[in-house]
Each structure stands twice: as structure tokens, then as C-alpha cells.
Amino acid sequence: MTNIRKTHPLIKIINHSFIDLPAPSNISSWWNFGSLLGLCLMIQILTGLFLAMHYTSDTTTAFSSVTHICRDVNYGWLIRYMHANGASMFFICLFLHVGRGMYYGSYTFMETWNIGVILLFTVMATAFMGYVLPWGQMSFWGATVITNLLSAIPYIGTTLVEWIWGGFSVDKATLTRFFAFHFILPFIITALVIVHLLFLHETGSNNPTGLNSDADKIPFHPYYTIKDLLGVLILMLSLMILVLFFPDLLSDPDNYMPANPLNTPPHIKPEWYFLFAYAILRSIPNKLGGVLALIMSILILAFLPFLHTSKQRSMIFRPITQMLYWVLVANLLVLTWIGGQPVEHPFIIIGQLASISYFSIILILMPVSGIIEDKLLKWSL
């Protein structure tokens, strides 16, 4: 009698994806983030579902319904803060996952990488719309500022913004449609994740050396299921410490004030995970230019396969590119800091310099360093 695991039409798919999947024997903990992102997505969908049971998407009651969830619903405070901080954990894992892909040259798997870039855009859109739902001051003004950016599109801009708003300002119609989109998008993300995995399993995983690992594969279970379990433990511990001890550490105090269209907060800023892109947007004085720079700050990832000039896939044996990579990481941290600062001297010039260096490193310096390293390698042989 054959094993049901290998014959049943449905179980067979799970078996080939998570149990008998041939995986390289040398993948490090940087490869844990895929499974952690899956866990984050599950947490967000489950907590979001329970929040949606008590939330009302009406401008007059939205803020009160969130207060009601925290005060009156059984463990409502826990569900709400797990959802809010779960988003932060999601983005931490996302950035580390993308960073790993850049460092080890995973972007050479074109289909997997491009689906990943689409996923990143979709998750960012979902998080933005979710931030609007509590209908606090920063929710309202964040929605107003970000949606208003679309008015920079020539000819159709203003009409497009009013179409998205469902009126002449951010109001009830906007909140209702944002709630609808925020509810449906995680399921679209789940579908995209399946496609992402489908393409990944066509080629198999990359590994730290960037070399072909077909000659040295081990089954995913038990080796990497146990390894992933450690990551799950660390992630859940970090999330629960954040939720139970510092629930408001990453949120804006302004969002505890109900939305008031007549009172603008002194500093309008998005959640911390959008600050780097927000800093790039603000560093360009022209509105359309800023919007294009904002989009390009993420879309640039899709060009990485074409900007790869080295004969080696991974950065592990490429010291010059390694140095540039870590300068890029530091640069992103500077941009994140600048995004949270007011628009005044010296923050404006720091933001502009950081934005220029962000694009320069990716578009010019890294491809040039790849060519230089290849030449040095050729001369040393």
C-alpha cells in the first residue's frame, strides 16, 4: 500500500511543497523569513477577521468602534494590538526577506522575484488602507496627503483623486471603500503568495554561495521545519513583548485623536515602515517628480536582474559590492529617520543627499563594482 502522502491529489501538493521538497543543505537562517511572512499573513488575516466583526466603516462611528473593541470586546485590546503590531512585524520580515534576496542574488529567479515585487506593492497598499480605518487624526490626514499625490498625474489627476475619494474630500465613501479593499486584498496577497511559491519550486531555492546545489539536497522536513520553528518562536516572542509591554511604541499619538478635517496635525507622517519612501518623496521639490521617485524607490527592485553585472551570483565573495550593500542599508535607515523629521534645515538637505545616494548605489555603483570585481578576479588568476 502506497503512502497517502504521496498519492492523494491534495496532500500530494502539500507533500511536494513542505515535506519532501528538496532543499539546499547549506541555507542559513536568512531563508527563514519566507515561512515567517506566511505566519504574519495568517496572523493578520485572523486578527483582521475578528476586528471586522466589531468595526463599523462609518465616519461618525469608526473611531468609537475601535475604542469599543479595545474596551468592551473580550480580548479586543489584544486582537487590535496584535493586528497593528503584526503589521510592523510583517514589514520587518519583508525588508529582511528582500534584503536577503538582494545580497545573495535571488533576483536572478526572474518570475519569483517579480511576483515578490508585486506582493510588496500590494502589502504596502493594504497597510496604507488599514492605517486609515481607525479614523484618527493621522489616519485622515495621511489618507488626504497620500491620495492627493495622484493629482500630480497630468490631465486626469484631479478627476482620479475625486473618483478615489468618492466626493470632494476624504469622507464616508472613502472610508467605506478603503475598508472593502483592506478586507479583500489579504486574500489576493495569499493567492499571489501561492504563485510566488509555485515559481520558486520550479527552480528550487537559492543558497548563500549562489552556486548550483542540485548535487547536495536534503528533504525540507524535518530539517527545515525544525529550523523554521525556531524562527517562529523568536517572531512570536518579539511580537508578544511588543503587544503586551509596548503596544503603542510604533504608533502615532495623533491617531488617538478623532479625525478632524478643520485641524491639521503639525507633522503629517505615515507609519514607520513607509518613512524611507516618504523621505524620498519629500526630497524632490516637484510634485510629479516626487511621486515618480516614490514609486521608483520600490519599483527599482524589479530592475535588479538587469543591473547584475558580476559573473558571481551572490555577494558572499564580492567585498566591494558587500561594502556598497551595507552603505545602502545604512542609507535606508537614514531615510527612515529623515521621513519622521519636520521639513526644515538640515533635514531637507540630508534627505536629498540620502535619496540621491540610494538611487546612485543601486543604479550606478553596484553594477560598476560588479564589473571591477570581475576584472580583479581575471587579473588574479
From Swiss-Prot:
Cofactor(s) listed in the protein's UniProt record: heme b
Keyword Nuclease among UniProt keywords: no
Keywords associated with the record: Electron transport, Heme, Iron, Membrane, Metal-binding, Mitochondrion, Mitochondrion inner membrane, Respiratory chain, Transmembrane, Transmembrane helix, Transport, Ubiquinone
Binding site for a ubiquinone: 201
Sequence positions that bind heme b b566: 97, 196
Membrane topology: Multi-pass membrane protein
Compartments, as annotated in UniProt: Mitochondrion inner membrane
Any one of the GO BP annotations: mitochondrial electron transport, ubiquinol to cytochrome c
Cellular-component GO terms for this entry: mitochondrial inner membrane; respiratory chain complex III
Binding site for heme b b562: 83, 182
Keyword Mitochondrion: yes
Positions of transmembrane segments: 33-53, 77-98, 113-133, 178-198, 226-246, 288-308, 320-340, 347-367
A molecular function (GO) term: metal ion binding
Cofactor note: Binds 2 heme b groups non-covalently.
PROSITE patterns: CYTB_CTER, CYTB_NTER
Pfam families in alphabetical order: Cytochrom_B_C, Cytochrome_B
Family: Belongs to the cytochrome b family.
Subunit structure: The cytochrome bc1 complex contains 11 subunits: 3 respiratory subunits (MT-CYB, CYC1 and UQCRFS1), 2 core proteins (UQCRC1 and UQCRC2) and 6 low-molecular weight proteins (UQCRH/QCR6, UQCRB/QCR7, UQCRQ/QCR8, UQCR10/QCR9, UQCR11/QCR10 and a cleavage product of UQCRFS1). This cytochrome bc1 complex then forms a dimer.
Function according to Swiss-Prot or TrEMBL: Component of the ubiquinol-cytochrome c reductase complex (complex III or cytochrome b-c1 complex) that is part of the mitochondrial respiratory chain. The b-c1 complex mediates electron transfer from ubiquinol to cytochrome c. Contributes to the generation of a proton gradient across the mitochondrial membrane that is then used for ATP synthesis.
Additional remark text: Heme 1 (or BL or b562) is low-potential and absorbs at about 562 nm, and heme 2 (or BH or b566) is high-potential and absorbs at about 566 nm.
Name listed for the protein in its UniProt record: Cytochrome b
Species this chain originates from: Chrotomys silaceus
Organism lineage: Eukaryota, Metazoa, Chordata, Craniata, Vertebrata
Gene (UniProt): MT-CYB
